[in-house]
Amino acid sequence: MAHKKTYSQLRSELLARYPVGLTKGGVSIDDIVQLRLQSPYESHLDVARAMASVMRADMAAYDRDTGKFTQSLGCWSGFHAQQMIKAVKRLRGTTKGAYVYLSGWMVAGLRNRWGHLPDQSMHEKTSVVDLIEEIYVSLRQADEVALNDLFNELKDARAKGATNKACEEIISRIDGFESHVVPIIADIDAGFGNEHATYLLAKEMIKAGACCLQIENQVSDAKQCGHQDGKVTVPREDFIEKLRACRLAFEELGVDDGVIVARTDSLGASLTQKIPVSQQAGDFASSYIKWLKTEPITDANPLSEGELAIWQSGNFARPIRMPNGLFSFREGTGRARVIEDCIASLKDGDADLIWIETDTPNVDEIASMVAEIRKQVPDAKLVYNNSPSFNWTLNLRKQVRAQWISEGKIAEADYPDGTALMSAQYDTSELGREADDRLRQFQVDISARAGVFHNLITLPTFHLTAKSTDELSHGYFGEDRMLAYVATVQREEIRRSISAVRHQHEVGSDLGDTFKEMVSGDRALKAGGAHNTMNQFAAE
């Protein structure tokens, strides 16, 4: 996107072309100004370039002040993304620091042609590209609707003979309008194939608008959700080649500031598909192989037909191989492998951010790993998955209980261990309140102590849709009937100033009326007349 021109600049340029203020066909230059300001991006590739610059600026701001971390919610439709960003703008008065996360899990579970699938790269890869494009269409339409309202306000003011000062104030709001378009962090899973397949998919995702790609170090054809068992990682040189594929896609398309997130699943991954070939001591292959689970080859434990042996520390050893041919890592090596993964991705893979998939939300655990990584890469920054796969209530209450017992503040018998801590009776207890305070502070703490630049929740709109639909259905099909809808949905929309309560306006009905006026004038057949029931929701 070129430098954004102001209302006055565009109008002056058009007036030079059409001195009477109209085209030969009778179109007003004021209408052309409106359409151009409503659609400043020539393509979604233009969006990717602009949002990459936004993200780079945010990363630099975080380096100066860890309190300036960014956030996102995972969205499985353009409408979810649009409503999230509208809510942020209504709350903060700005979209600054708010992104959209595109979750591969939700694409698999909700946005593919084969039904609800697990997060195992089983869905068609084009679904990811389609969702990126859909999200940006929705965000850009939110801009069009909001700016159309401002232009209608300007037209009404002029029609009523408002002063120049009053009109200039509206024009100032048009020029200062902050777009709903924000960066997307898009999940490319493990690349959906080999390096070339990764590159081809990355290009399509970028052309759809993605300024940031997140890729993981699992085997593409054996990929699992990061919070499931049976994860299989690839050797580091293989993963670095996929990172390079993503970088080449950005470079080819001229997205110089494109951001790559390298995710490691090694903390919970106990298997590898292959043993890489080491060329010399200390290379990527040797540092990967050293963590394999092996057993010594002796006269009492010789090699059998078809078995493999590797040379380690001056002796031959047998790597433990599963019945499916996969090789096992030694137990307790996940943390060390994560640290090595992250350093390699940042130093040799040209990744910009790292993502460590964990099994519990523990600030101390993440911070300790980041401290080791920063010995090699001092400015290492993370994306952290505040995952719905964690039982947050139970985890935080258990952390508080354990700490208070170790400090002598409580006895073990004061609060139960395990799932009993989930009981609602502890919601208002001292321990429950402390756990909730830590939840409220969690993202601040992990960003300050563990280098987390971006906090996201992967699947919130999946769970929100399930919960809100259940809530409405329970009342509507129960005794409350229409009261259930009015009390739990419509009244809340009105009282919270949620623009979607005017659903016709939200999806662009007024945009259509405006365009009809542009081309038809008084002949326009408009939907927004006196008999439109949306008038019942007009702002007081």
Curated annotation (Swiss-Prot):
In the presence of magnesium, inhibited by oxalate, potassium cyanide, manganese, silver, cadmium and to a lesser extent by succinate, glycolate, iodoacetamide, DL-penicillamine, aluminum, sodium, potassium, lithium and strontium. Its EC number is 4.1.3.1. GO terms for biological process: glyoxylate cycle; tricarboxylic acid cycle. Its cofactor is Mg(2+). Mg(2+) binds at residue 187. The active site is at residue 225. Signal peptide: none annotated. Optimum pH is 7.5. The enzyme is stable when incubated for 15 minutes at 30 degrees Celsius at pH 7.5-9. It comes from the Bacteria. The keyword Lyase applies. Keywords: Glyoxylate bypass, Lyase, Magnesium, Manganese, Metal-binding, Tricarboxylic acid cycle. Pathway: Carbohydrate metabolism; glyoxylate cycle; (S)-malate from isocitrate: step 1/2; One-carbon metabolism; formaldehyde assimilation via serine pathway. It is an enzyme of class 4 (lyase). GO terms for molecular function: isocitrate lyase activity; magnesium ion binding; transition metal ion binding. InterPro entries: ICL/PEPM, Isocitrate_lyase, Pyrv/PenolPyrv_kinase-like_dom, Pyrv_kinase-like_dom_sf. Involved in the metabolic adaptation in response to environmental changes. Catalyzes the reversible formation of succinate and glyoxylate from isocitrate, a key step of the glyoxylate cycle, which operates as an anaplerotic route for replenishing the tricarboxylic acid cycle during growth on fatty acid substrates. May be involved in the assimilation of one-carbon compounds via the isocitrate lyase-positive serine pathway. This is Isocitrate lyase. It comes from Hyphomicrobium methylovorum. The lineage of its organism: Bacteria, Pseudomonadati, Pseudomonadota, Alphaproteobacteria, Hyphomicrobiales.
